[in-house]
């Protein structure tokens, strides 16, 4: 049985990514998602990159997306010739993969397409594997990564690693020319250390030199999630709802590694001005 046939045989229900169907018998039917069988065929359509993109997107949000058959499809699709497919595959693998899949996403931080690099950085926020720390540090480095969105997401991904080299890299990145990166770095440092010293590199350096236990007050790490308020039409019965997520630990990160010290830690330091 071919790969596409196996995928079709294994699907059970795609629950999101509504699309408008022309010729549907009713307004509700017009917004039904493609069938699981069609989504699987789309995801493996070797002639149509747009179909592969849509198929992977549909499968990645289904309730069976974490099954090995589909995770393997997402892995293979990270090598697709089309950058859009690589990007959506990176997103799917980050959402449904295992800690070891971080090693698949890590090389994608060097992809020539910025959107692929962005999705790889976001995916690495959801997969915990210390082997990818050097790649994330490079993605945070202004001299090595030109896209500020990638640098910001890399900063947030690094916040799950309680290592001195990570703190050093984040403090250095406070000098980044992008305000968005500055705030992402600050948020990462707050999660790691429990301190809130603002955006001034010198203040963080002074504190870091003064402490022997930089991670004692850490708040613990949960990956950033998508959340938004309902739009007016989403209050209509049967309309698709926002794909809001619940914060959680990355795959491979133990709760023991993220909790405990914060319960008895001193209060966070007040923010200071200057940079």
Model-derived segments and their meaning:
Residues 55, 89, 120, 154, ...:
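Conserved hydrophobic register position within alpha-solenoid helical repeats
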Residues 30-43, 64-79, 98-110, 129-142, ...:
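Amphipathic alpha-helical scaffolding segments comprising HEAT/armadillo-like alpha-solenoid repeats
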Residues 197-243:
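Pro/Ala/Gly-rich low-complexity, hydrophilic intrinsically disordered segments
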Residues 58, 92-95, 123-126, 157-161, ...:
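Core register positions within helices of long alpha-helical scaffolds
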Residues 47-48, 81-82, 112-113, 146-147, ...:
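Short inter-helical turns and helix N-cap capping residues of alpha-solenoid HEAT/ARM repeat scaffolds
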Residues 2-10:
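Bacterial N-terminal signal peptides
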Residues 13-18:
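Bacterial signal peptide processing site
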């Amino acid at each position: 049985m071919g790969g596409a046939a196996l995928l079709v045989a294994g699907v059970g229900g795609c629950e999101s990514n509504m699309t408008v169907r022309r010729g549907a018998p009713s307004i509700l039917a017009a917004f039904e998602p493609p069938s699981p069988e069609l989504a699987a065929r789309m995801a493996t359509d070797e002639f149509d990159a747009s179909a592969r993109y849509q198929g992977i997107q549909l499968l990645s949000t289904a309730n069976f997306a974490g099954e090995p058959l589909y995770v393997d499809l997402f892995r293979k699709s990270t090598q697709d010739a089309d950058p859009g497919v690589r990007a959506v595959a990176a997103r799917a693998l980050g959402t449904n993969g295992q800690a070891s899949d971080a090693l698949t996403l890590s090389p994608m931080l060097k992809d020539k397409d910025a959107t692929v690099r962005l999705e790889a950085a976001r995916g690495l926020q959801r997969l915990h594997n210390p082997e990818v720390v050097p790649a994330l540090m490079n993605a945070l480095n202004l001299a090595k990564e030109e896209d500020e969105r990638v640098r910001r997401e890399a900063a947030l991904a690094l916040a799950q690693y309680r290592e001195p080299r990570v703190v050093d890299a984040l403090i250095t990145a406070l000098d980044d020319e992008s305000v968005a990166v500055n705030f992402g770095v600050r948020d990462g440092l707050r999660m790691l250390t429990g301190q809130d010293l603002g955006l001034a590199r010198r203040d963080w350096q002074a504190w870091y030199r003064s402490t022997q236990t930089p991670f004692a007050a850490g708040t613990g790490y949960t990956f950033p999630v998508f959340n938004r308020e309902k739009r007016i039409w989403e209050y209509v019965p049967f309309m698709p709802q926002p794909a809001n997520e619940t914060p959680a630990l990355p795959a491979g990160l133990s709760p023991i590694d993220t909790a405990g010290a914060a319960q008895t830690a001193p209060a966070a330091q007040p923010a200071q001005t200057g940079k």
